[in-house]
Amino acid sequence: MCRRAEDLVLLLIPILFGYFSHASEHECKCVLFNVTSGNFHSPEFPAPLEGVPCLFYHFQAPPDHIIRLTFDVFQLPPRIGVCSSSIMLFDHSTDGLIEFGERADFEFCGKEISSGRQFFSKDQHFLLQISSGKESSRGFRGSFLAIPKKNFTSDAVEMAECSYRVEKQKAIIYSPDYPYYYPSKVNCTYHIPQRKGFQIVVNSIVMDIGRDAILQIFESVEGKFEKRLIEMVTSVQKSIYVSSTSSLLIYFSAGNNDVERAVGFVIELQYSNAVWSQSPETASECQLNINSENFKEGQLSSDKIGRFTSSSLPTKCQIVLQGYPNEKISVKFTHFNLYVPDNKNVTKRCTEVDNLSADVRVGSRLSRIDEWCGKRAPPNLMSSSNLLQLEYNTKSSKAIRESTNDDIGFRLDYKFHTDWNMGNMKAKVDKKKECRFSFNSSEHTNGKLWSANYPGLYPRNLYCEYIFHGRNDQVVHIHFEYFDIEGFNQCDETTQSDYILFSNYQTHDRTNRRFCGKTAPKGPILSESNYFRMIFSTNDIFDATGFYAHYQFITQEKSQISRVKLTISSSQTPFSSFFLVILLFTFRYIANIF
């Protein structure tokens, strides 16, 4: 498709950005992106796009990789019957070549590509064709990334063609060719064998099957031939959750997918062995399990828990709140006053007096948040997974507690939820991302934003994105009113710090520093353009109360100089940047000749 231009400069300088070829018959030029990540945009962006009759962008990944394109800006003249200007995507080429006149897999114009939309190639080549008439438009901008195909390999043993057996404690299975759309007429089976003392939990991460497809889950007992249908998924269903102590067989029949091009499914499978239930010896002391299958929200009081209602002895009680795999748990204390003898000092340690501790599940282990005693009430708590455990330890007897005139004990409200409880932030929530919020100036020119569970402790192992989209002539100001992010120094991995990072790109931006600690950034944070991204990342070690900020889209005067910034990889030396500039000017010179 793209041929190397016979030019001395191109022969001497390694190609960092791409190269042009002159097709004498069809007058198409081609730019090759042969690095693993970077940014792309319409010619001369942010200057208007016009008068580009035929230009190809060829994205080439290493072998056994695929290409992902992500758009953050897309605005061409609108479709009036047909597109006067458009981009066409060819996502299935095996060698980077297409035939003249070959029909594209996708054609877009107007505002038909929303911000954040992603496209995947089937193999290592992805071709994007630009065709622009005389009518000017804003153009487009995005990022590309080469991804190893092995990232989408099912955690299962392939017994025959598209027939798998799951043998791991926890596994993820993918539909054929995911994240590319699955082929038509394919039939696949996934066998999850029974394990004594375990239940199998099936939870969908992605569920997008076409109208002609069907996914069925059958239950059977090992050693027996009969099976029972327990779940049937069609195109209208976007999620599944199934648990069983028997063997499971997942059967997928694709039907025809040539037109609809559904991407299929990503399903998480896990053997759950009642880790959180107690042995008869310990369970007899005090154990309370609250499951979201029965109660999505409710209240709890310490004087209603287990042996606290009758025992006169010191004891401890575990309260386990467990939801579905896609749920989180929030806890808010409405009363907290634990008994403390007059001769005890609880300013430093709570272990010698009545206390309450909280743990959350991180991976396969429980991680302690903190412990509280006296009248120091816990902050609002939120888990990042589907399990949160409280443990109430009493050193005092019931008689001593009741002898006081104080209201001894605690009361709390709990809630199971699938979102981050941030609906009041007036942001658009990306359902395909775990924690992504978008702010568009067409809806609100200013507003507030905050960390999950603010003003309580933010969850652990969190990665949240706050995306800002303004008009062409707008930038974004962000000003922090409250800032408490656990960390210090450079806020990097060596200090095990949580952090906030700002970026003007969708890919990783090393030019912007991280922020953490208790000191907010000085003055407002200002974006370079109308697109801005704020990242909030937490680890699984420590906690803090997060941040509260306000944002505003501000209209600026248009620059007298049109500046173009081309970024292909995350790092370039001054030497390579110098030759890149020479190369770009050479391309323009060649283009003018032809």
Swiss-Prot record:
InterPro entries found in the cross-reference section: CUB_dom, Non-NMDA_GluR_Accessory, Sperma_CUB_dom_sf
Coiled-coil segments on the chain, per record: none
Stretches assigned to the CUB domain: 28-147, 162-272, 286-417, 435-554
Gene Ontology BP, a term: adult locomotory behavior
Compartment list: Postsynaptic cell membrane; Synapse
Assembly: Interacts with glr-1.
Disulphide bridges: 83-109, 162-188, 286-317, 435-464
Keyword list, A-Z: Cell membrane, Disulfide bond, Glycoprotein, Membrane, Postsynaptic cell membrane, Repeat, Signal, Synapse, Transmembrane, Transmembrane helix
Function field: Accessory protein required for glutamate-gated currents. May participate in the gating of non-NMDA (N-methyl-D-aspartate) ionotropic glutamate receptors such as glr-1.
Topology relative to the membrane: Single-pass type I membrane protein
Keyword Cell cycle in annotation: no
Residues of the signal peptide: 1-23
Protein name in UniProt: Suppressor of lurcher protein 1
Gene3D superfamilies: Spermadhesin, CUB domain
Expression (tissue specificity): Widely expressed in the nervous system. Also expressed in neurons that do not express glr-1.
Bilayer-crossing regions: 572-592
Gene assigned in the entry: sol-1
Carbohydrate attachment residues: 34, 151, 187, 345, 355, 440
Gene Ontology cellular-component annotations: ionotropic glutamate receptor complex; neuron projection membrane; plasma membrane; postsynaptic membrane; synapse
Cytoplasmic side: 593-594
GO molecular function, one term: channel regulator activity
Extracellular side, ranges: 24-571
Effect of residue 323 to R: In ak66; induces delayed reaction times; when exposed to a drop of hyperosmotic solution
